[in-house]
Design a protein with these regions (language model features):
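Catalytic Tyr-x(3-8)-Lys segment
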Residues: 80-106
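Active-site loop immediately N-terminal to the catalytic Tyr-X3-Lys motif
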Residues: 25-31, 53-54, 101, 119
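Short, small/polar-rich loop/turn modules that mediate ligand/substrate recognition or access, typified
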Residues: 52, 57, 124-126
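Short, flexible catalytic-loop segment of classical short-chain dehydrogenase/reductase
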Residues: 41, 63-73, 77, 81
């Protein structure tokens, strides 16, 4: 919100939030995380409504699992907790709900963000762009 006055004055701005697939769906045992991600999406949609009178767009990228250090730690922790191998965590827990069975690449997120920053996306606002390998199709 600190940037909005400047964006309004210039009549231009692009805001991209990084949410999660959990911005649009829930999962058991993740209530605080899901609530935070839903809140981020609500904030983005509200901000998009508030900036609809100028060339400012507000969108949220909602990826499924991206292989980051945080996810690597989750894999190791879940392997110990469930008494299974890390590969089994990846195959049977993390990628199981995704028809594509692959982690989302940083390059995929960057390409989507680059498009949203372009003038070709000037009428795309208040959107949750879900990049989830088909997870939410179920």
């Amino acid at each position: 919100q600190a940037l909005l006055p400047n964006m309004r004055q210039q009549n231009y701005g692009r805001i991209i939030n990084i949410g999660s697939v959990h911005s649009v769906v829930a999962s058991p045992f993740k209530s605080a995380y899901v609530a935070a991600k839903h809140g981020l999406l609500g904030f983005a949609k509200t901000l998009a409504l508030e900036t609809g009178d100028c060339d400012v767009t507000v969108n949220t990228l909602c990826p499924a699992y991206v292989k980051t250090p945080l996810v690597e730690n989750q894999i190791a922790a879940q392997a110990i907790e469930n008494g299974i191998s890390e590969q089994e965590v990846i195959d049977k827990i993390m990628l199981a709900p995704m028809p594509k069975k692959a982690f989302i690449g940083i390059d995929e997120l960057a390409a989507t963000a680059a498009f949203l920053l372009s003038n070709d996306a000037r009428n795309i606002t208040a959107q949750a762009l879900v990049i989830d390998g088909g997870w939410t199709a179920r």
